[in-house]
């Protein structure tokens, strides 16, 4: 394609719809043709001399897909056309939420913006009208009109194309048909790219990846799969007739099979053994043999065997998977007319006896997860995500959950699997909680599969656990039914998903912000508006401060003084952010309700500083490093009047505000605030004292938590690791007795701590480590007898929770443990794997956040890293042959006199350890 000049007066011709740039090959060598196409925006090239937009439908040509098949030029002849081009680019990026950081350049020269591979982050569908100009075999496309297409409306258009076809005239059908076919082709090409392990495009890495998009892609996969099977199978030799799973021959020895073709039935794994190491595909289809019963689900086909550097799951070789119906599954079809069959009471004991490979479909409620709070997918490098599922019955559910007794513990074993189920950018506790409807009474449907779980810190062959395979919610199904059958051109862009996700962004202070070179984060911050600039036509620039400091590199802070010109923010004490016009209009309208004026009216002439108003804002911000500097885009901004705090901020965010008020009051100064008392009292909890000076009054900042008047609150009790043993009733027992289901049944009034201490012996078979929870999986069953993996019901989980207990266990300060890399601590714990130890444990309750439901857990007492090392060094003491005898049951790490005295009801004074370095954790 060559660069030609656009004709001044293009001819009036009928516009031709093109589905590929290959259509241009049949055009005359010298021609001017109006054309139209639909494609994905892939690149933006904006310099001082030209403006180019790249589009592609990713049609394959040979072995590679041709990117930027349509390279469109915008007019750039003079200042007027240049300004129009920049406004067009700005509006287009604003629609698709693409940041343009350099448009706010401080220099006088026109900024340069070069963005590539936009489709790797977001799908920007666009309908373009262009002028095709060719000469001597070369051609150029000149943009005449561009219409961005919202992804929600694109999916709706494809899904309802058959319905719409009957409502249009024949002339309209041509355009609608071309539009639908192009959109379908693009999605099909993206699916092929997603399957290709070498291609960087993956659906789960998209910013707007969610359950709706996932289900739509799966539906498209099924259509592609049916077409490919119909074309590929030889009618004279059909492998499936012989009971053999069909799979293309070129994939038989492909170690990355599951990333290439997820639509084919699962291959026979009986001959693969331990040699096949797969990585789960981000978008997978449901198993072909259960399509009728799992079509309602929104997640992927279960991976039978997957391995990652951190963790792997597997199935025994004697378990055969084929299409002959011999799978060990108990199917409960959602399409069965007898809907009550799925709501029958769950037998948790029967579920605990299920064999590996079994699949169950259940309806009920996920009431909690562990860890309950996390901010990043990287926190699961050394632990799993556990969900606690219970059935919804007419009676009031139990307040105390005991896995295997009145609930099911569902494990998501790997980081990759978490991303696959919820999306890369949804891997935060608040967002996953929202997806799972933890805070709502709605029921959900889950499909779980029995798998073997093990990792680097798990004794072979691992544990048989229930893993989440599919999930469905009624609210999502209703939302899909209610989507109107309209064309993409008539549907306004949906911002509902963005606002919903923004409410779940983690709340941090400016000093806590850290970014890697290519990292993008979505955060919530509270801050005071310091200054505002309307210099740029495409967006508004702001300076905010929460009065914490961060040395991250950013653009210069303008007009940064705080009421008095002499009192200026330091350059690392605030941050510069931009807001596009549609977000600003919403923000400005809220300010008008408070001040009866907009921001422009509040400014004093050309003075851009607004610190005299004390405007406190809650901001949902997208942050990223661009050209080595902080690029912050405010996606949603809301003023926070002090009288409305309880409706705007959550209880945890109120604590952020409380600290913010203290910093702001100290930094701005009591005298300065007093001069603008009437303005500041709108946003700050202040009152006048006897000297007519402003004072903070925190009693007005309290956030009233929601209380249930009919439900007595459970008391969470996490015992201290260094608790006095003499305060417990000591019982010597074994793990089997503690795991007995009747013994673990929650008591009706179990709302207080346990006073019983159990002394028992167990072998550590797995270790999970999270920043908030250290978990030892222990059992007393012999390893030689376990050839199919231990069931969780035969394993006791010991949890060490709270920073105080962490510090006591490692004999280090909390500050030191926060600085110490997770890998280092995890490696130190590995030496205990597979060995038997004596433990003193007690039953405890941990509450799920914002609920009245508690989880029963086991916590050790008098257990430290050093004490476990001592037991490891003296195996005869730690692993006695008769675990039932009194002498052998006493933990070698606890003073035996104290235990015996406690058993006889005698209190023994705890002796202090004078060896300061005795408990130091070795580095190796």
UniProtKB/Swiss-Prot annotation:
Residue ranges: DNA binding: 500-686
GO CC terms in record: chromosome, telomeric region; CST complex; nuclear telomere cap complex
Principal cellular location given in the protein's record: nucleus
Entry annotated with the keyword Transmembrane helix: no
Annotated Gene3D superfamilies: 1.10.10.2380, 2.40.50.800, 2.40.50.810, 2.40.50.860, Nucleic acid-binding proteins (2.40.50.140)
Signal sequence interval, chain numbering: none
Modification Phosphoserine, positions: 306, 333
Comp. bias regions, Basic and acidic residues: 309-326
Consequence of changing residue 228 to P: Disrupts interaction with POL1 but not FUN12
SUPFAM superfamilies referenced in this protein's UniProt entry, alphabetically: Nucleic acid-binding proteins
Residue list for modification Phosphothreonine: 308
Effect upon mutating residue 243 to R: Disrupts interaction with POL1 and FUN12
Region (Disordered): 265-336
Subunit-level organization: Interacts with POL1, EST1, FUN12, STM1, STN1 and TEN1.
Something else known: Present with 319 molecules/cell in log phase SD medium.
Protein's name according to its UniProt entry: Cell division control protein 13
Protein's organism: Saccharomyces cerevisiae (strain ATCC 204508 / S288c) (Baker's yeast)
